From Swiss-Prot:
Its biological purpose: Catalyzes the synthesis of the hydroxymethylpyrimidine phosphate (HMP-P) moiety of thiamine from aminoimidazole ribotide (AIR) in a radical S-adenosyl-L-methionine (SAM)-dependent reaction.
Protein residues bound to Zn(2+): H443, H507
GO cellular component terms given for this protein: cytosol
Presence of the UniProt keyword Ribonucleoprotein in the record: no
Binding positions (substrate): N245, M274, Y303, H339, S359, R360, G361, D400, G401, L402, R403, E439, Y466
Protein name: Phosphomethylpyrimidine synthase
Length: 633
C-alpha cells in the first residue's frame, strides 16, 4: 500500500492543496497477497465486496499441503479494488441510485432547502473549496416515509438489507461445506448473554436482517442522499462494528487532511466515520468526505450550529438547529448525534462530579438550558426532529451528554437519568419509524461495565448500543487506546453493537493519521475479541489460520493474516531483516535452539517416527505368528 502524502496544517493554501488532489492522491490500497472478491446478490447491482487473503502452501516430509484463502470483511470500498477508477474530485459511483428510484417514494428537489446550504453554495469566498459535482438533493414525497425501519415493518426486504446480509455472512455458508476448511472453522462456544446470535452462517439471511431492523435491534444507516454508500448493519446480533472519528478544529488540520484521514480510516477497517469538525469550512469538508465515503457518515449537528452563532451557546435557537439538520441531511449524513436527553433538571445532578460534564454536546446544551432556564429545545422539538429524519432516512445516535468523564463519576444518578430519557425518546422515534441507536460511556471501571449494558437493554428496549470505549482506568494518557480497548472488548461481548475508537492522543490533542491507524487497529481487535466471545459463526477462522501459519513458520502468511500486516512484518524485520528469515523456523525472541514451536515439531516428528517403528515391529510380529512362530525353519 502507498502511504498517503503528508498534507500541511492550515496555511491559507487550501485551494492549492485541493488542486493537488490527483486521481488517486496516493491512497489506493494494495493489501499483501489479497484479492478483492464480489459476492453477487439477487440482482446485478448488488455486488458485495470482501477480501480474500491467499496463503502459501505448507511443505512437510510427507509432501505439500495447500492452505485455502481466508475471507475477511472489507470496508475499503473502491479504494481496495485494483480495477476501480478513483478520482476524489468526482466522488465515488452512485451504487444506490437505481434502488432509490425504483421505490418511487422520493423526489429530486429543485434546489437546496437549507438557507445556510444555499448561502454556502453561492458564497464566492468558498468557491475554491467547493466540491464541484454536487447533485440536487432527494427528499421523501409528501406523506411518505423512506426509512429502512419503515420498510422492514412493512415486510419489505430492500436491496440495502440484502446487501448487509450478504456482507455479514461473507460466504461462510459455502466454507462450512468445504472439507479443506473443516479444521479452521473449529470454534469455542460463545456466551451471548441472551442475544439472538445466529448459530450457522445460513441463518444470516435478508429476512433475518429485516426482522432485526423491524424489532429496532439493528439499524442500516443509509441516507437517501448518500448513494455512494455500501450498506452495513449495526446491531447486537451481528458482527461488532467500529467507528472512527475525524474532523478539523480551530487550532489544526485542513480540509484535504481530513479527506485523507477518512480514506486512511477505511484502509484499516473503520465501519463508520464521524466528522466532528469544529473549525473552518465545516460544510465544505463534510461534502468532500461524504462524496468519497463508501461507509456511513455521522455528525454532531450542534457543533456546526454553535459555529454559526460564533461559539455562543446562549444564542442557539431551534430554527438555526433545524436548518442545520436539513443542510446536513441534504448533503447525505447517515446518522446524527442528538443530545436530547440532557434535561434541565439533570444538570444539577452533575455538580458533585469529579469532572462534571465532559461531552461537548452535553455541555453546550446544559449551558443553554441554564442560561435560559428552559428545557432543552432538542427534547421539546423532538417530534419535529423525527419528521426531518424520516424524510431523508437519517438515523438517530441519541447522545450521552452526561456520560462520565472519569471512573469516579461512572454509573451515577445523572448518567442513568439521561439513559432512561433516551429510552423514552427511542420509543418516540420508533413511532415515526426512525432508526435509533444509543450512545454510551465513557469512563467506567471494569467491574461496572456490564451494568451499563444491562441498563441500556432494559430501558432502551434493545436498541443498538454505541459506546466510547469505555476507558477502565484514568492513569494512562498516551495509552488510552488500550485503557478503552479493554472496556470495549468487554462491553462488545455483553452486547454493544458498535464501538467508537479512541486514539493514543485522547485527552491530549487532535489525532494524526498514525494515531487513527493505531486507534482503528486497537478497536478492530476489541470488536473481534467480542465476536469470538459471543460466538459469532466463523469468527475464529482467521485466528485458526494464523495460528496454523505460526506453527508451520509461514512468516509471510502470519503477516498477511494479521490486522496490521505492515507493522507485524516491520517488527519481525527489525532483528531478522534477511529474506531467508521469512522461511526460518525461529524468530529473534528464542533463537534457533529454544523455539518452543520448533521443538514441538521435532517432538511430533520423533513421535511419528517411534509410532512408525512400533507399527513396523507389530507387523513383523504378526508375520512371525502367521508363519508358525518357528525360530528355525
Amino acid at each position: 500500500m502507498t502511504t498517503p502524502k503528508k498534507t500541511a496544517k492550515i496555511s491559507g493554501n487550501e485551494a492549492r492543496e485541493l488542486s493537488d488532489l490527483s486521481e488517486d492522491i496516493g491512497i489506493r490500497f494494495k493489501y499483501q497477497n489479497s484479492e478483492r472478491v464480489y459476492l453477487q446478490g439477487s440482482r446485478d447491482d448488488i455486488r458485495v465486496p470482501l477480501r480474500e487473503i491467499r496463503q502459501d502452501d505448507t511443505y512437510t516430509a510427507q509432501g505439500t499441503e495447500a492452505n485455502p484463502p481466508i475471507p475477511v470483511y472489507d470496508t475499503s470500498g473502491a479504494y481496495g479494488d485494483p480495477a476501480a477508477h478513483i478520482d476524489l474530485k468526482q466522488g465515488l459511483p452512485h451504487i444506490r441510485t437505481a434502488w432509490l428510484d425504483e421505490r418511487g417514494d422520493t423526489e429530486i428537489l429543485p434546489k437546496l432547502s437549507s438557507e445556510y446550504g444555499i448561502e454556502r453554495a453561492h458564497d464566492p469566498k468558498t468557491a475554491h473549496l467547493r466540491f464541484n459535482q454536487i447533485t440536487r438533493p432527494r427528499r421523501a414525497k409528501a406523506g411518505r416515509n423512506v426509512t429502512q425501519l419503515h420498510y422492514a415493518r412493512q415486510g419489505i426486504i430492500t436491496p440495502e438489507m440484502e446487501f448487509a446480509a450478504i456482507r455479514e455472512r461473507m460466504k461462510l455458508d459455502e466454507l462450512f461445506r468445504r472439507p479443506e476448511y473443516a479444521k479452521l472453522l473449529k470454534q469455542h462456544t460463545g456466551q451471548s448473554f441472551g442475544a439472538n446470535i445466529p448459530t450457522r452462517p445460513d441463518q444470516i439471511t435478508p429476512e433475518f436482517v429485516r426482522q432485526e431492523i423491524a424489532a429496532g435491534r439493528a439499524i442500516i444507516p443509509a441516507n437517501i442522499n448518500h448513494p455512494e454508500l455500501e450498506p452495513m448493519i449495526i446491531g447486537r446480533n451481528f458482527r461488532v462494528k467500529i467507528n472512527g472519528n475525524l474532523g478539523n478544529s480551530a487550532v489544526t488540520s485542513s480540509l484535504t487532511e481530513e479527506v485523507e484521514k477518512m480514506v486512511w480510516s477505511l484502509r484499516w477497517g473503520a465501519d463508520t466515520i464521524m466528522d466532528l469538525s469544529t473549525g473552518a469550512h465545516i460544510h465544505e469538508t463534510r461534502e468532500w468526505i461524504i462524496r468519497n465515503a463508501p461507509v456511513p457518515i455521522g455528525t454532531v449537528p450542534i457543533y456546526q450550529t454553535l459555529e454559526k452563532t460564533g461559539g455562543i451557546a446562549e444564542d442557539l435557537t431551534w430554527d438555526l438547529f433545524r436548518d442545520t439538520l436539513i443542510e446536513q441531511a441534504e448533503q447525505g449524513v447517515d446518522y446524527f448525534t442528538i443530545h436530547a436527553g440532557v434535561l434541565l433538571r439533570y444538570v444539577p445532578m452533575t455538580a458533585n462530579r469529579l469532572t462534571g460534564i465532559v461531552s461537548r454536546g452535553g455541555s453546550i446544551m446544559a449551558k443553554w438550558c441554564l442560561a435560559h432556564h428552559r428545557e432543552n429545545f432538542l427534547y421539546t422539538h423532538f417530534d419535529e426532529i423525527c419528521e426531518i429524519m424520516k424524510a431523508y432516512d437519517v438515523s438517530f445516535s441519541l447522545g450521552d451528554g452526561l456520560r462520565p468523564g472519569c471512573i469516579a463519576d461512572a454509573n451515577d444518578e445523572s448518567q442513568f437519568a439521561e439513559l432512561h430519557t433516551l429510552g423514552e425518546l427511542t420509543d418516540k422515534a420508533w413511532k415515526h419509524d426512525v432508526q435509533v441507536m444509543i450512545e454510551g460511556p465513557g469512563h467506567v471501571p471494569l467491574q461496572r461495565v456490564k451494568e451499563n449494558m444491562t441498563e441500556e437493554l432494559q430501558h432502551c428496549f434493545e436498541a443498538p448500543f454505541y459506546t466510547l470505549g469505555p476507558l477502565v482506568t484514568d492513569i494512562a494518557p498516551g495509552y488510552d487506546h488500550i485503557t478503552s480497548g479493554i472496556g470495549a472488548a468487554n462491553i462488545g461481548w455483553y452486547g454493544t453493537a458498535m464501538l467508537c475508537y479512541v486514539t493514543p492522543k485522547e485527552h491530549l490533542g487532535l489525532p494524526d493519521k498514525e494515531d487513527v491507524r493505531t486507534g482503528i487497529i486497537t478497536y478492530k481487535l476489541a470488536a473481534h475479541a467480542a465476536d469470538l466471545a459471543k460466538g459469532w459463526p466463523g469468527a475464529q477462522l482467521r485466528d485458526n489460520a494464523l495460528s496454523k501459519a505460526r506453527f508451520e513458520f509461514r512468516w509471510r502468511d502470519q503477516f498477511r493474516l494479521s490486522l496490521d500486516p505492515e507493522r507485524a512484518e516491520s517488527f519481525h524485520d527489525e532483528t531478522l531483516p534477511a529474506e531467508g528469515a521469512k522461511i526460518a523456523h525461529f524468530c529473534s525472541m528464542c533463537g534457533p535452539k529454544f523455539c518452543s514451536m520448533k521443538i514441538t515439531q521435532e517432538v511430533r516428528d520423533y513421535a511419528d517416527k517411534q509410532k512408525a517403528q512400533r507399527q513396523g515391529m507389530e507387523e513383523k510380529a504378526v508375520e512371525f505368528v502367521k508363519k508358525g512362530a518357528k525360530i528355525y525353519s
